[in-house]
Design a protein with these regions (language model features):
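Alpha/beta-hydrolase active-site loop
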Residues: 88-120
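Acidic catalytic loop of the alpha/beta-hydrolase fold
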Residues: 228-232, 257
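Catalytic active-site module of serine/aspartate enzymes centered on a nucleophile-bearing elbow/loop
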Residues: 255-259, 263-289
Length: 289
């Protein structure tokens, strides 16, 4: 039987705001430096959604330190239920906040003693990012601006924030100051305040995925997307590949947006497609040396 990973939980803060946010790390504690994977959830996601803890254990058993975080304004309250419950925080989230949250985590990992992770367990020269869905777009942007990142994997990644907003929706959103979306899983009515769009426009140079992938993303990139994705079109994967021709792209037949996962996930094994995504990502990272 495989060894059980050590799991440590910790709180983070960002210089961009005053809201603390949670992260955890799964690893086999052997005192040897291991490559580090940082995993970023997507829109309406959180670090303990579905099979993500099974995923973290699997990566740990394959020789990685696997760190995942709750982005600070994702709706999860530190010490709360673990699910989405703070709708005001959710509504005031934006892409700059998320990028800065991820940066705060990377900074903390590079400062011994800032997290409970022993420095002896970390090989910071092999720092990999994985992002799912909107988190996939986020890790592309972070890698483009942060040379500490060794390589990136996008799992059903968003390729462009801008094209998701039709002109009529934008007009109504600006006029009302807020739009609401429904969480199909919980039935919650979730606000998105117009500041999200304002932040994107004000920081477009930093937040424009197509431009940053074409001009600044130098690290190796793996793109994984299901051909039955019901949330983000498969064309997004092809777009990313066209902007970064040296990227490796894998289309998974029959895979949906969550690669077979759901919340809650009581099983102790990964969904079939999530297992394939994990294995392909592990091989990609390990082949980089």
């Amino acid at each position: 039987m495989a060894d059980s990973p050590t799991i440590v939980d910790f709180l983070l803060t960002s210089p961009s705001h005053s809201r603390p946010f949670e992260a955890d790390a799964h690893y086999l504690a052997d005192g040897q430096p291991k490559p580090l994977v940082v995993f970023v959830h997507g829109f309406k996601g959180f670090k303990d959604w579905g099979h993500f803890n099974v995923l973290a254990d699997y990566f740990a058993q394959q020789g990685f330190v696997f760190v995942k975080l709750n982005l600070s304004h994702n709706g999860v309250v530190p010490g709360g239920s673990g699910d989405l419950e703070d709708m005001e925080a959710f509504g005031h989230n934006n892409f700059s906040i998320e990028l800065d949250d991820l940066g705060a985590l990377l900074d903390a990992l590079h400062q011994p003693g800032t997290t409970p992770l022993p420095a002896t367990e970390l090989d910071l020269g092999r720092l990999f990012l994985i992002g799912h869905s909107r988190g996939g777009g986020l890790v592309l942007l972070k890698a483009a601006e942060d040379p500490r990142v060794t390589a990136v994997a996008g799992w059903a990644p968003m390729s462009d924030y801008d094209q998701r907003w039709p002109a009529e929706v934008m007009r109504q959103w600006q006029a009302n100051g807020v739009q609401y979306i429904e969480n199909g899983r919980t039935g919650q009515r979730m606000p998105l305040y117009y500041q999200l769009a304002e932040d994107f426009q004000a920081n477009r140079t930093r937040l424009d995925i197509p431009v940053n992938v074409r001009t600044k993303l130098r690290q190796p990139l793996l793109i994984l997307h299901g051909d039955e994705d019901e949330t983000l079109p498969l064309q997004m994967a092809h777009d990313l590949k066209s902007w970064k021709p040296d990227a490796e792209m894998v289309i998974l037949p029959g895979a949906n947006h969550a690669f077979g996962g759901g919340h809650p996930w009581p099983q102790h094994t990964l969904p079939e497609h999530a297992q394939e995504v994990a294995d392909r990502t592990i091989s990609f990272f390990k082949n980089l040396g």
